[in-house]
Amino acid sequence: DRSETQEKAHPVMQLLSAAGYFALARFDDPKAVLARPQPKLPYLTAAWHYARGEVFAKQGDLTGLKAEIAALEAMKIPPQGADESKAPDQMVAIVRLVLTGRLAMSEGRWVDAQTAFRSAAEIEETEDFMQFSDPPAFWYPVRRDYAAALLAAGDKAGAKRELEATLKLRPKDPVATAMLAGLAS
């Protein structure tokens, strides 16, 4: 709750605090997520839009999902100094691309979903982002969504390849493991 009223925080601290919004999107009551006030800090605002977008995607509310994507695209975050971590800005790009992929999947646009998820995974897997924190700064390996988009388009071999790549980076990811087992059966 403090993150919603705080007016100053280093971008890296905001990125770490964003995990709270990721958890809310996954586990909290959708009405509670949508009722949360917009934070004042820019990177937390991006995480807030992401959480709301995930709720809208789960509810099939494509209008709401599109509004959250548009809000992320319109965000103007002051550039970091040259010595600063790129991870906070990368997080904003990841959440925007993940929601873009969710929208494309909801609309049956498999190639667009693949493009969005692949781009998000590539950012998530950069050295700057991967080395930023342990556990990883983003809550799940986006490459598994890329695999899901490939599978939705009928590309089982591509999905298998991407799930195996996911498990090289996060060997115990339960969703990627289950998806890979499902392909084998």
Annotate each predicted stretch with a short phrase.
Residues A19, A47, A51, V92-V95, ...:
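"A position-specific structural signal for the A-helix of alpha-solenoid helical repeats
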